[in-house]
Amino acid sequence: MSKSRLTVFSFVRRFLLRLMVVLAVFWGGGIALFSVAPVPFSAVMVERQVSAWLHGNFRYVAHSDWVSMDQISPWMGLAVIAAEDQKFPEHWGFDVASIEQALAHNERNENRIRGASTISQQTAKNLFLWDGRSWVRKGLEAGLTLGIETVWSKKRILTVYLNIAEFGDGVFGVEAAAQRYFHKPASKLTRSEAALLAAVLPNPLRFKVSAPSGYVRSRQAWILRQMYQLGGEPFMQQHQLD
């Protein structure tokens, strides 16, 4: 290898190492800060806002209103757990059984990819990472998930998740969603309304709370049944999530 190529390789290696250190400090600081402080915006919100501007849409505003857990209906927390991650109170950030099932499903159905992200993983990637699929992103997501599971309580993870989750075009967080779709604060959401919001979470830009399709309605009904099977509101109290 020539001296010039070695120099370039050395420069790239030093640059990548420094970048990794900077990102580690940035993300570590974010995990520590947001363990107690309200989250003003997420990486997904920034990405959506910048994308809108680049496409000439200057009316788009990625909107979110932070609320604490005692300002959110307990039905909402239960609904997202029932819909997205029923083992949330028990696991350490990853649902291994669901991951294995998703991998087996994806091998059989290459055109219908199934995910297995827990609420902790979704919180990590929505808060800190860009949209998309890659092994690099998955690796970073795993590290960030371990970080928030180590530093944050389960209640804190659920609180942040509910405040940064995307519920529609420009609608981020359960308070903004409750005001937009039901004209009430998140604390007043009913069991049915919470289940409807949770029903669009797999793809909130495709599925509409304001005009729910037959699929969304059937998913809402399924979530309501799962909420009942989990035990209703006592489930949240039992696991100190309310």
From Swiss-Prot:
Transmembrane annotation, as ranges: 19-39
**Superkingdom per UniProt:** Bacteria
The record's Pfam families line, in alphabetical order, gives: Transgly
Bilayer topology term: Single-pass membrane protein
What does the UniProt keyword field contain? Cell inner membrane, Cell membrane, Cell shape, Cell wall biogenesis/degradation, Glycosyltransferase, Membrane, Peptidoglycan synthesis, Transferase, Transmembrane, Transmembrane helix
Q: In which pathway does it act?
A: Cell wall biogenesis; peptidoglycan biosynthesis
**Annotated compartments:** Cell inner membrane
| Catalytic activity entry | [GlcNAc-(1->4)-Mur2Ac(oyl-L-Ala-gamma-D-Glu-L-Lys-D-Ala-D-Ala)](n)-di-trans,octa-cis-undecaprenyl diphosphate + beta-D-GlcNAc-(1->4)-Mur2Ac(oyl-L-Ala-gamma-D-Glu-L-Lys-D-Ala-D-Ala)-di-trans,octa-cis-undecaprenyl diphosphate = [GlcNAc-(1->4)-Mur2Ac(oyl-L-Ala-gamma-D-Glu-L-Lys-D-Ala-D-Ala)](n+1)-di-trans,octa-cis-undecaprenyl diphosphate + di-trans,octa-cis-undecaprenyl diphosphate + H(+)
Q: What's the Enzyme Commission number for this chain? A: 2.4.99.28
Could you say which protein family the record assigns here?
Belongs to the glycosyltransferase 51 family.
Function noted in UniProt: Peptidoglycan polymerase that catalyzes glycan chain elongation from lipid-linked precursors.
- Can you say what this protein is called? Biosynthetic peptidoglycan transglycosylase
Which gene is the coding source of this polypeptide chain?
Answer: mtgA
